[in-house]
Amino acid sequence: MSDSASNTEDSIQIEIFPSRILSPETAQKLMGEIYKVDGVIRVMVQGNRLPDRVSAGPGTGEKVEHPLRKPIQIGDQVIELKICVGRIRVELSNAEAKEQIREVCEKLLPFPFEFREGHFLRKKPTVTDYAKLGPEADPRLLGMVDPKAKTDQLIFIEKQKEQEEDKDKDE
């Protein structure tokens, strides 16, 4: 078994860093289009946590109705946003996917953004990965665990193999 988080050692990692925090609607459109690109291995969305309850002051314990805390749909799964979408990190299997994602960003983001290539996602397990996921963790989840999050808050969306098989039958 390989220590790599992906099947290819020469994967490409990119970071999309918009100059503004994305609204839930824009985040849904962008993530939906990224989800459709062939060659995407894994995606991590990063940003400030949106509080669920008031933690201090006179309203301690009251529920917070934040306008950015809305459910979004990616593929067939509905997810409640618990963060402000600030940056998106993507691991890709080829350079063609990189250009497709750049085109998607240019089409959907009406404001400037940085599009960088580098090493953003870990490929070897950290202490947090070991504590949260165990010794036999899925390599695609390595480096993607928030140390403060509970294990039930981790969201993993896998492309449906049935959809890919249907595409092969149609061709």
From Swiss-Prot:
InterPro entries under this entry? Me_CoM_Rdtase_D
Q: Which cysteines are joined by disulfide bonds?
A: none
Name the keywords, alphabetized. Methanogenesis
Pfam families xrefs: MCR_D
Any single GO BP term:
methanogenesis
Quaternary assembly: MCR is composed of three subunits: alpha, beta, and gamma. The function of proteins C and D is not known.
For this protein, the record's NCBIfam families field holds: met_CoM_red_D (TIGR03260)
Protein name per Swiss-Prot or TrEMBL? Methyl-coenzyme M reductase operon protein D
